[in-house]
UniProtKB/Swiss-Prot annotation:
GO MF terms held by the record: UDP-N-acetylglucosamine 1-carboxyvinyltransferase activity
List of residues binding phosphoenolpyruvate: 22-23
Annotated keywords: Cell cycle, Cell division, Cell shape, Cell wall biogenesis/degradation, Cytoplasm, Peptidoglycan synthesis, Pyruvate, Transferase
UniProt name for this protein: UDP-N-acetylglucosamine 1-carboxyvinyltransferase 2
Catalysed reactions listed for this entry: phosphoenolpyruvate + UDP-N-acetyl-alpha-D-glucosamine = UDP-N-acetyl-3-O-(1-carboxyvinyl)-alpha-D-glucosamine + phosphate
Primary gene name: murA2
GO cellular component: cytoplasm
A Gene Ontology BP annotation from the UniProt entry: cell division
Native species: Streptococcus pyogenes serotype M1
EC nos: 2.5.1.7
Location in or out of the cell: Cytoplasm
Amino acid sequence: MRKIIINGGKALSGEVAVSGAKNSVVALIPAIILADDIVILDGVPAISDVDSLIEIMELMGATVNYHGDTLEIDPRGVQDIPMPYGKINSLRASYYFYGSLLGRFGQAVVGLPGGCDLGPRPIDLHLKAFEAMGVEVSYEGENMNLSTNGQKIHGAHIYMDTVSVGATINTMVAATKAQGKTVIENAAREPEIIDVATLLNNMGAHIRGAGTDIITIQGVQKLHGTRHQVIPDRIEAGTYIALAAAIGKGVKITNVLYEHLESFIAKLEEMGVRMTVEEDAIFVEKQESLKAITIKTSPYPGFATDLQQPLTPLLLKADGRGTIIDTIYEKRINHVPELMRMGADISVIGGQIVYQGPSRLTGAQVKATDLRAGAALVTAGLIAEGKTEITNIEFILRGYASIIAKLTALGADIQLIED
């Protein structure tokens, strides 16, 4: 069993570069199946989710070369075969294969997706959109069968009942090679959607409106190869900004797009966090007094659900009482009992997280229950006095590239142990 050991209380300083966006690349890689030639992605993060996606692509017949942060995929050999359940079950973003396989073959046999357990994240919105485009859905054991019965998937006018990043991207990808025009209303607006649309348009797609709540896709017959730069990971950036504010004495976070983090930075400024925003970087000063605030997550451009857990250890250093309300994923509270083990004055009341600061954290044995909860525990361990041992770290490695090396370079006493 692998675990992370942190000897906390050491102030961090220096510079850390943000990697490419996990939430983009897990959609970009499956979308490449639609191409008729080689596609190259630059800025690909070294995370286990990428490794899993590469393995799936190779099992399906793609030729893949991955060196440094550059990923080259030739999808011409991809075959219409049932997708491997084991890999699919461990990877939530595997549902992005639905849209690309339907777009290329008009059918797909896939296992249901896995990933972090954050409560209801139904794929009903995806399936409703596919059905509007002529897809029939059936189930056989652990597999889901999607088929157009030999017909070409067709365009449709689709209204998303709930704002959903995954369903928006999946529908957009499926519509790229569909016959006719597709309109997605109440579409999600996240930067990662724009990133996927940019890749597809560079391949020859006709997508307009990505980043707004109405996206229009005019189907095309062929998509050529291209080269694409993955956008910076705004969630990783926010995690390091919060971490730097909590235990830093001057940390510069580079490869940051401020416009992707405006709501997050506004809440930090409300707390009293002192920082300087540069063209593609943010410098976080050593903090003095911070005040407690209320956080309420909402779809982009609101406060990202993925950032409420990584921010929690910093909130615990603030003076006063505050609350965290996650309107996106109701079960995103699993970090709370682990932080309580470390001495945090924090609890869940009526589905809301309530905290009282400042809390003095001490090292403890804790368990990462999901990706962003794991990030919260890493920050808490860096703040805490004494030794913190984090288990179940596979969740953390799913989404944070080179996290041990990056934190070590900032002066953290942190190591990954293989038991």
